[in-house]
Amino acid sequence: MTASELFDYYRTTGALTEEDCLDYISWVQDAPDVTKSAMAVSGLTLSLLENNWDRRKVELLATSANSSLTTGMVTERAIIGLLLVMIQYDTEVRTDQTLIDALQESLLSNPGLAFSALCAITRTTQVKGVEEYNKSMAKELQPLLSEQPSEKLYDVFQHHQQEIERITRLHLDQNFSFFKDAYQTPFFRERAANWFIPWSDTALQNINEDDREHVQKLLKVWIMCDSDKYALGSMYSMLRSTLQERIPLDGLASNKREYVSVDGYVQQMYRFFRLSSFTQAKPFDIVTQLREKVVYRWVVVGRQAQEAISELLQGV
């Protein structure tokens, strides 16, 4: 099967049998094509987030998240998927001690990555916070705007402005409105798997040769996740006249912040559940509503990590 077919299979398959699990584990340990493994992990993750609880699927995610068995992109996707599933199915997980032990073992195999993934998920949920604050600000300011300027009007505006600035300082998706349009191309309407394909330079072959050099430079910008690259690449000819105006390429490209790949994959997940017509699930809304569940006393690695996450969440 191709990578996309593997994604579709694990996303749409029903409850797994014990034989299915043994086949999957054997396949992962044989270290096949990394892209296929990563797409299979994404399919498993979506199957759980979109449908119903399946303990065996969670166990397979835990196996894929264990860095003693997998590496690189496969491990990263599995850890992020595992954390999202644990948040969504908090009750089911916390009442199953055997499963808790298995999940804990997988996350402890790469504590730094698990912590980074948890922080990335937490930061990403703040994107919705910007929208909510904008609506709240409009609702509170509207009646005040019909009156004479007052101290109250200034205070309300200042409060909301500070809140929005605080949220955006967390390095959130500041170009989200731009990419919302870019994701309307046929590539993303054809199949759900296209939202999760790892970026490949071969995709540039569809771009006019005169534009290719500039697009290659643009696609090295750290802030862009893989699906953004496909979105921008497939829509480049239509955006040509306004591209430099909408995305300050030089400013972004010179940013010294180290790229964290888990941030990119969380962005891809967020975009899929936010913009895709393939799903009605809203796992990131659950994360936002149940924020206290992000700080798992049996997930975070050691007191220092737990304190760091608690500090991150203060005031949210």
Model-assigned labels for residue ranges:
Residues I207-V316:
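Alpha-solenoid helical-repeat scaffolds
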